Amino acid sequence: NSFLNFFPTTAVILDVDADHLDFFKDLSDVEHSFREFAELVPQGGLVVANGDDANTVETLRGVDYVSFGFREENRVHWANASEDFRTFDVICDGKPYCHVSLGVRGRHNAMNALAAAAVAWLYGVEAAPVERALHAFTGAGRRLEYKGRYNGADIYDDYAHHPRELHALLETVKTMGYRRVLCAFQPHTYTRTKALFSDFVQELRGVDVA
């Protein structure tokens, strides 16, 4: 709940899910905290949220927010996306806003870029600097971070410690053209592993060796 100590004028909610269950009681408890966070935004501020995520939509029921996502029902959505999600157009209120060409792969990175573009559009930023900034983003450490090559295999490090993050990671790897994928998974916290064990197992079944 440390984010409830902030004083946001703009709140961006990428998704809401059951996590940190050593602190939160359950998903409803998580949703309650995210709603409190959104309600910290003062009048005249902005709440920008993932309209594709059912938990987020439920959390913000009755809250005024701008939705972004891949579906056309969102005020900000994409079009003409490439197979690896690195390039796409951003459509805002039905009109083309900018063309995104990312230096990182993955549906989750595309969603994050959509969120950033949505905020920029709402604040009246022109398309060109948005395109430049998103193209220059090279990713965060331990997020599909290339570590080198060993015995002919490319080695990557990723901090994916939740089933949804693991799903996003492995879906991204599938777009990279590898013949075989091996995943060495280190569980992070006993509480999370116990609560989400079956979901972790389901995701790890998607690779050749885990």
Regions found by a protein language model. Give the residues of each.
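Active-site beta-alpha connecting loops in nucleotide-dependent enzymes
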Residues: 140-142, 159, 164-209
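Acidic, Mg2+-coordinating active-site environments of NTP-dependent enzymes
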Residues: 4-155, 178-179
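Switch II (G3) loop of P-loop NTPases
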Residues: 1, 155-161
